[in-house]
């Protein structure tokens, strides 16, 4: 995920190198949660299951092999494709904690799922701040 401009000062100067080290050296260019490979087009079903071209099998959202699922060529109407892009995520959502044990290489899907609680928290704070402004000024704040 892109770093917000007002959060850039929280990251170290060598963030690009640190991020690349986590994504490509430690994780080997694969998502550390589901195992999707960086830079490849991946067939998936939208619920976390994806086709692992190398293994010739379906995998679930945790990277485990899935049994009893037909090959993707027989399920074309249900499959979608996505280009996988790895990003480095902070496990504790604290951008100042750049210890290697706190960083994870995640694909878009896993990153969004990992950040879900943090996004909901920020959304609630934004809602409350806007509602507080509504108490000060007239307007459609309902």
Residue ranges and their predicted role:
Residues 48-49, 57-60, 114, 129-136, ...:
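Alpha-helix boundary/capping detector
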Residues 1-18, 74-89:
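Short, charged low-complexity linear segments at domain edges
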Residues 27-28, 35:
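Glycine-centered helix-boundary capping/hinge motifs
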Residues 29-30, 106:
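The −1 position to Zn-ligating cysteines in a subset of zinc-ribbon hairpins
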Residues 16-27, 96-99:
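Short, flexible, mixed-charge glycine/proline-rich loop motifs
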Residues 35-105:
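Histidine-centered nuclease catalytic patch
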Residues 35-42, 103-126:
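Short Cys/His-centered divalent metal-binding micro-motifs
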Residues 101-102, 119-142:
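A detector for short metal-coordination/catalytic motifs
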């Amino acid at each position: 995920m892109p770093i917000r401009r007002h959060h850039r000062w929280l990251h170290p100067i060598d963030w690009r190198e640190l991020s690349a080290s986590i994504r490509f050296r430690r994780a080997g260019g694969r998502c550390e949660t589901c195992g999707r490979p960086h830079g490849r087009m991946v067939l998936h079903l939208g619920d976390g299951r994806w086709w692992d071209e190398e293994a010739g099998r379906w995998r679930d959202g945790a990277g485990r092999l899935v049994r009893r699922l037909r090959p993707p060529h027989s399920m074309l109407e249900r499959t979608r494709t996505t280009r996988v892009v790895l990003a480095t995520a902070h496990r504790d959502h604290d951008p100042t904690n750049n210890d290697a044990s706190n960083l994870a290489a995640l694909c878009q899907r896993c990153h969004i799922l990992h950040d879900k609680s943090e996004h909901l928290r920020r959304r609630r704070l934004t809602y409350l701040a806007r509602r507080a402004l509504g108490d000060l000024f007239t307007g459609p704040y309902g």
